[in-house]
């Protein structure tokens, strides 16, 4: 069964689902199983699973089994493979049941074996079976990375690279021939010296060709793969980034270099070296057919043993790769919560969690080291045995004048070459498997999502118009259904409602960050260039203060008076002027040399600058005290200097309601929009604001 690794903890069941579909002959990637832009907030519900079952023409059954029975009594061969719940919060695929062991594929780490006792400790008791319907059709899928890889490696650069490797192999063989001729005294010193100079020249030529081809291929790889991955990432909807941790996305991005290096540095050289061996065999056969046959037989025996280790090493590498990704995700998650960890003195728990995850990574890495150690020890032992047997056999042939001593030296070199070729073929098979996994993990990033085209009516008096807008995480389970309203240019709007009512969802619809049903029309030309945003997750970058608040900080074009006016309106001018270099002072990464409230006020200033006309604020006052908050209410929301700028905000500070033109109130999936005083006549709104 083809192994499919999960992208994150949330889609482990989808990874298992993908593996079962692949077993039946329908090759479907995890990202193709997503219904929309993300897994619903409440997880993989029954309706969600029913939809993908219908789409992929399979039937699903869920069983609760008695855990008192042993695995061979719970699972019978014909029902395998099946999905089971694991540790109460995870899913895996059971593939084989043996007398004492169970083989399963964990989408977090790959294929693993458990004895009955350990298996039953982790098995939660729930079994999910999938079976094809009568309408089920098989489907082969070509990974999205295959086509761009062909473009990169099917060209002149690859030919030059392979040719340079071929020259290098020929030089190595040529060296052995020259050495044999010197020992046989076949040529004089002058001839031998000329041959040595020629070897150096050809080796240098090979190196120059190789470096040139590698550099050109790297540039092509960057333009075809890396750039496409970057475009694919930024074409993803906002919900994609909420469904995947920063650590997971970074790890997936970094896999691209592993694919390039695996092809250039391992697969190509190894394949060429293996094929060069056949030339060596032909040459050695002309010296002594008997010794060549002996050499081939010995290396076939070596190959049989070595190849038995490939699957074990491949699985160990899968585990190590996934464990590394998991460890990075845990570290990223904890570091994002460092303030809470410090405040609650949870450092010991974090150290314990990191240590456990790191130990799992080291355990997987040690398995690779063990396999490499066994392989290395066997290689050395085989070399010793093979050389000794070759010498014993060769001396016997030498006594019969069938081979010379220099010939034996050539055959000794042949042993090393053969062993190296077999090892490299192992590496090729290992790399192909590894790169297949890497390719599948980043395949979704190579797909550029089509972008919604904003509907613009630039001469409209409205900043935005919503017509028959509906939104749902799941089919027919609508958060909003057929909502209609408009906001005029220059209006200041506050969105309020109880927690979980859908404020952020509506905010993201207005901003065009999530998909929806219906039509949104904007009243601004070049909309995306004149939008200012303050979100809960925004922060400052490392660099000067001016670089953080002004998009074009060309000193000749800076309107210092305008910048100072805005900084004064958000109550930051006095602080900025107290800095050594004022607005040109340097900020640390994430603005760590400022307080949370100062960062928030600078972000508000940034949203108001840069010729922005349509402003969106999501909880912009969460870190501000009453004094600074009221200052912004009076100096921005009520300031005629900002009358042409439309501001839409979410805020849990209800004192802002007296300073805005209208309020959008969300209650039980319904939307009311009116002036604050008019909405107070509504019992639900009145109760909400006076709680």
Swiss-Prot record:
- What keywords are assigned to this protein? ATP-binding, Bacteriocin transport, Cell membrane, Hydrolase, Membrane, Nucleotide-binding, Protease, Protein transport, Thiol protease, Translocase, Transmembrane, Transmembrane helix, Transport
Gene Ontology CC: one annotated term: plasma membrane
**Alphabetical GO biological process terms:** bacteriocin transport; protein transport; proteolysis
Location of the Peptidase C39 domain: 6-130
Q: Where is the ABC transporter domain?
A: 464-689
Tell me what topology the record assigns in the membrane. Answer: Multi-pass membrane protein
Looking up SMART domains in the UniProt record yields: AAA (SM00382)
Q: Where is the ABC transmembrane type-1 domain?
A: 158-434
> Which cell locations does it reside in?
Cell membrane
Q: What is its main location?
A: membrane
The positions flagged as active site in the entry are 12
Segments crossing the lipid bilayer: 159-179, 189-209, 262-284, 289-311, 385-405
Name the positions where ATP binds.
497-504
Q: What is its EC number?
A: 3.4.22.-, 7.-.-.-
Q: Which GO terms describe its molecular function?
A: ABC-type transporter activity; ATP binding; ATP hydrolysis activity; ATPase-coupled lipid transmembrane transporter activity; cysteine-type peptidase activity
Q: Which InterPro entries match?
A: AAA+_ATPase (IPR003593), ABC1_TM_dom (IPR011527), ABC1_TM_sf (IPR036640), ABC_transporter-like_ATP-bd (IPR003439), ABC_transporter-like_CS (IPR017871), Lacticin_481_peptidase (IPR033839), P-loop_NTPase (IPR027417), Peptidase_C39 (IPR005074)
Q: Which family does it belong to?
A: Belongs to the ABC transporter superfamily.
Its biological purpose: Probably implicated in the export process of the lantibiotic lacticin-481/lactococcin-DR.
Name by which UniProt lists this protein: Lacticin-481/lactococcin-DR transport/processing ATP-binding protein lcnDR3
Q: Tell me the organism.
A: Lactococcus lactis subsp. lactis
């Amino acid at each position: 069964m083809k192994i499919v690794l999960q992208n994150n903890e949330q889609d482990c069941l989808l990874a298992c689902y993908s593996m079962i579909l692949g077993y039946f002959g329908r090759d479907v990637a995890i990202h193709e199983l997503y219904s929309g832009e993300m897994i619903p907030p409440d997880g993989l519900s029954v309706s969600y699973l029913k939809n993908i079952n219908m789409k992929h023409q399979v039937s699903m059954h869920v069983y609760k089994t008695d855990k008192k029975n042993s695995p061979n009594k719970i699972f019978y061969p014909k029902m395998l493979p099946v999905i089971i719940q694991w540790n109460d919060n995870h899913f895996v695929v059971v593939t084989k049941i043996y007398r004492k062991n169970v083989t399963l594929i964990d989408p977090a780490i790959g294929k693993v074996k458990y004895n009955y006792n350990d298996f039953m400790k982790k098995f939660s008791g729930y079994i999910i079976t999938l079976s094809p319907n009568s309408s089920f059709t098989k489907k082969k899928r070509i990974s999205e990375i295959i086509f761009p890889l062909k473009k990169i490696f099917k060209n002149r650069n690859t030919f030059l690279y392979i040719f340079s490797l071929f020259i290098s192999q020929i030089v190595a063989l040529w060296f052995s021939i020259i050495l044999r001729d010197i020992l046989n005294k076949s040529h004089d010193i002058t001839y031998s010296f000329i041959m040595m100079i020629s070897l150096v020249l050809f080796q240098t030529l090979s190196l120059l060709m190789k470096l040139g081809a590698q550099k050109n291929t790297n540039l092509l790889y960057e333009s075809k793969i890396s750039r496409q991955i970057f475009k694919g990432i930024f074409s993803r909807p906002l919900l994609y980034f909420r469904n995947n941790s920063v650590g997971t996305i970074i790890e997936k991005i970094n896999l691209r270099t592993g694919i390039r290096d695996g092809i250039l540095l391992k697969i190509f050289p190894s394949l060429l070296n293996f094929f060069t061996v056949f030339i060596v065999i032909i040459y050695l056969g002309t010296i002594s057919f008997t010794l060549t046959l002996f050499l081939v037989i010995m290396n076939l025996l070596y190959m049989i043993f070595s190849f038995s280790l490939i699957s074990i090493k491949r699985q160990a590498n899968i585990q190590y790769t996934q464990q590394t990704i998991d460890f990075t995700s845990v570290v990223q998650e904890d570091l994002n919560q460092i303030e809470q960890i410090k405040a609650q003195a949870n450092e010991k728990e974090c150290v314990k969690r990191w240590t456990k995850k790191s130990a799992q990574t080291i355990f997987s890495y040690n398995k690779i080291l063990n396999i490499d150690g066994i392989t290395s020890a066997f290689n050395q032992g085989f070399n010793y045995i093979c050389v000794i047997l070759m010498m014993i056999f060769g001396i016997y042939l030498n006594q019969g004048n069938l081979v010379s001593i220099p010939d034996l030296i050539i055959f000794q070199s042949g042993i090393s070459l053969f062993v190296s070729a077999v090892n490299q073929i192992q590496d090729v098979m290992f790399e192909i498997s590894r790169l297949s996994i890497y390719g599948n993990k980043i395949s979704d990033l190579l797909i550029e999502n089509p972008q919604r085209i904003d509907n613009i009516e630039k001469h409209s008096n409205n900043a935005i118009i919503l017509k028959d807008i509906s939104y749902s995480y799941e089919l027919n389970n609508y958060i909003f259904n057929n909502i209609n309203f408009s906001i005029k240019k220059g209006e200041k709007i506050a969105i309020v409602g109880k927690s979980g009512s859908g404020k952020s969802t509506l905010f993201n619809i207005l901003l065009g960050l999530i998909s929806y049903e219906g039509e949104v029309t904007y009243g601004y030309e070049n909309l995306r260039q004149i939008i200012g945003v303050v979100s809960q997750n925004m922060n400052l970058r490392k660099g000067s203060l001016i670089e953080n608040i002004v998009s074009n900080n060309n000193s000749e074009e800076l309107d210092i008076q305008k910048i100072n006016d805005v900084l004064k309106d958000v109550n930051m001018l006095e602080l900025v002027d107290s800095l050594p270099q004022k607005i040109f002072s340097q900020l640390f990464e994430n603005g760590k040399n400022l307080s949370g409230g100062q960062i928030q006020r600078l972000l508000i200033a940034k949203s108001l600058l840069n010729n922005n006309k349509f402003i969106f604020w999501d909880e912009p006052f969460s870190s501000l005290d009453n004094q600074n908050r009221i200052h912004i209410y009076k100096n921005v929301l009520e300031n005629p200097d900002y009358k042409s700028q439309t501001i839409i905000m979410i805020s849990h500070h209800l004192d802002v309601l007296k300073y805005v033109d209208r309020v959008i109130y969300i209650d039980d999936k319904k939307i009311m929009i009116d002036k604050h005083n008019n909405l107070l006549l509504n019992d639900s709104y009145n109760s909400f604001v006076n709680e």
